Amino acid sequence: MPAIDIGRLAVVIAGRRAGQKVVVVDIIDKNFVLVTGAGLNKVKRRRMNIKHLEPLPEKINIERGADDEAVKAALEQAGISLE
């Protein structure tokens, strides 16, 4: 299983956004990360428990705390969709 790190794509497995893909933007502590859907799906930028995420093998090259526009550009450059 891939590690949770900055730029890693993941699927939300718990809560009302279960099944949605997100991008990890920042690591807050050992239990929480900051994720975003980058305006490409209904997941807004928010803190999320690592236990509620299933990491995917895909990873994009972004800086820590990147804004949604930078994340969207990196996803388009890599040819990855969050749909």
From Swiss-Prot:
Biological processes per GO annotation: ribosomal large subunit biogenesis; translation
InterPro entries reported in the protein's UniProt record: KOW, Rib_uL2_dom2, Ribosomal_eL14, Ribosomal_eL14_arc, Ribosomal_eL14_KOW, Translation_prot_SH3-like_sf
Alphabetical UniProt keywords: Ribonucleoprotein, Ribosomal protein
Pfam families per record: KOW (PF00467)
GO cellular component terms attached to this protein's record: cytosolic large ribosomal subunit
GO function terms (MF aspect): RNA binding; structural constituent of ribosome
Annotated CDD domains: KOW_RPL14 (cd06088)
Family label: Belongs to the eukaryotic ribosomal protein eL14 family.
Protein name: Large ribosomal subunit protein eL14
Organism, as annotated: Thermococcus sibiricus (strain DSM 12597 / MM 739)
